[in-house]
């Protein structure tokens, strides 16, 4: 006879679902508005999306730390709240980039903004749960929306990028599902805290380490795809090149924040259980990723592809902090992305401004270095701002990313990994070359003759976004200490 199911309203705790429900409801409202009136201007959808995200931000900020909800499937801890806030802030920065001075195909569709909000909800589900099934649901919700957003750019290479991303995403999802299945077979649970408890009691069993090895390898491969770690990074440059510049910048930050949070929960569990080879594997992947991506970035002819390889290198840099498995190391991950987010989105936004009606310099690339030759004479303020972003990405003090790099290196040294800090320093020196290369083109070279250079995509919303990104990049020295204190408090309160 089946046992009766008792549903406790206390265990529901639906307030933990509020941020995701706000994003989903917002997307549905936009679709309904389009059904009622198909002629509404895109600026209305932009403003409505920003309003929904602001409400979402407030709902997330109002959550209590270390709370469970929805039958204990939702986990609201410090890491969950921080990552949701960062995801929303990154999204608020991205959305105004739709209000360009020219009409672009994807932004004329209300579905673009609805899909964008559904994607945000997917990312929020990923970071606000330690249940492997809900993480998978969030991952696929966000991924399917993102594939469509890339394709909506409506160019041949955008379709190619969407198909490549879809193929790699499907492969990553398969590895994640298989890894989760092995974990469930081992422990009889898909909730990470229960998985850790069961594994801890069975570590000495014969043959168990082989099964743990299988699950960890499958999950590592899945998140290596999502974080574009070597050797699973090959899709990223082509996808970034095919996507619109703002969306490429967004993809280099927000999806990776969500993937890093899940990686912290899963691989931190393995390291805490004493599975030391997981730490070693992560360190090897991190070093190979940051080094090889930097070497590839050195030989790129296109600024957008250079920034794509740069983003891969930064992901490797941060992955090394994950292997430390300390509160300081985990804090450095969130600090780095909080600072990197403004700088990298700002850099990609500058590419969005410097558009041409036709490819004037190269048959393949949209943003070859030659395009930026003499940029200081064509658009002086833009050249200075782009130069600041490049100096920040290179880790030059006192700009924002410098503080992130220093904190990650400090965490490595304090954990006894002096060699890792040295590798990070050497990679930062290599990266400085290709960032300074663009600065040399902009400030020390003459504009290409006999070419009518047009930078025509600037609008006031874009100016506001770039101004905000510039202030965050230049003024980091004034807010870095309070930011570190807040992040450290929230992460230590979560037990990481």
Locate each region found by the language model.
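Alpha-helical transmembrane segments of multi-pass membrane proteins predominantly involved
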Residues: 1-496
């Amino acid at each position: 006879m089946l046992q009766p199911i008792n549903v406790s309203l206390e265990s529901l705790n639906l307030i933990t679902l509020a941020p995701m429900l706000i994003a989903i409801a917002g997307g549905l409202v936009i679709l309904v508005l389009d059904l009622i009136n198909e002629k509404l201007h895109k600026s209305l959808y932009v403003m409505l999306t920003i309003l929904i995200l602001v409400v979402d931000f407030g709902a997330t900020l109002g959550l209590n730390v270390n709370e469970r909800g929805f039958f204990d499937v939702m986990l609201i801890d410090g890491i969950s709240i921080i990552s949701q806030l960062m995801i929303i802030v990154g999204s608020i920065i991205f959305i105004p980039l739709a209000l360009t001075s020219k009409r672009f195909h994807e932004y004329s569709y209300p579905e673009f903004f609805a899909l964008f909000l559904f994607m945000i909800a997917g990312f929020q589900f990923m970071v606000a749960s330690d249940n492997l099934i809900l993480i998978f649901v969030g991952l696929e919700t966000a991924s399917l929306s993102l594939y469509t957003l890339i394709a909506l750019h409506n160019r041949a290479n955008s379709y190619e990028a969407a198909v490549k991303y879809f193929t790699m995403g499907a492969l990553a999802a398969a590895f994640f599902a298989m890894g989760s299945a092995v974990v469930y077979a081992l422990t009889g649970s898909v909730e990470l805290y229960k998985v850790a408890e069961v594994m801890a009691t069975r570590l000495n069993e014969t043959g168990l380490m082989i099964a743990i090895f299988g699950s960890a390898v499958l999950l590592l491969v899945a998140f290596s795809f999502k974080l574009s770690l070597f050797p699973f990074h090959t899709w990223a440059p082509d996808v970034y090149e095919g996507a619109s510049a703002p969306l490429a910048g967004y993809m280099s930050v927000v999806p990776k924040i969500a993937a890093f949070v899940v990686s912290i929960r899963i691989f931190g569990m393995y390291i805490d259980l004493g599975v030391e080879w997981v730490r070693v594997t992560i360190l090897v992947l991190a070093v190979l990723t940051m080094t090889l991506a930097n070497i590839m970035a050195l030989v790129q002819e296109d600024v957008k592809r250079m920034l794509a390889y740069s983003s891969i290198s930064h992901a490797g840099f941060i992955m090394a902090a994950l292997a430390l498995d300390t509160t300081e190391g985990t804090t450095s991950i969130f600090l780095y992305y909080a600072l990197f987010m403004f700088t990298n989105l700002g850099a990609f936004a500058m590419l969005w401004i410097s558009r041409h009606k036709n490819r004037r310099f190269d048959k393949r690339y949209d943003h070859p270095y030659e395009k930026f030759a003499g940029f200081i004479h064509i658009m002086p303020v833009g050249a200075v701002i782009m130069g600041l972003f490049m100096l920040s990405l290179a880790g030059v003090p006192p700009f924002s990313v410098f503080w992130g790099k220093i904190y990650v290196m400090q965490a490595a040294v304090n954990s006894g990994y002096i060699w890792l800090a040295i590798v990070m320093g050497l990679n930062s020196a290599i990266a400085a070359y290709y960032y300074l290369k663009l600065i040399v083109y902009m400030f020390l070279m003459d504009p290409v003759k006999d070419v009518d250079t047009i930078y025509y995509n600037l609008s006031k919303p874009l100016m506001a976004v770039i101004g905000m990104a510039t202030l965050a990049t230049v003024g980091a020295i004034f807010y870095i200490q309070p930011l570190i204190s807040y992040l450290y408090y929230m992460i230590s309160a979560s037990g990481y």
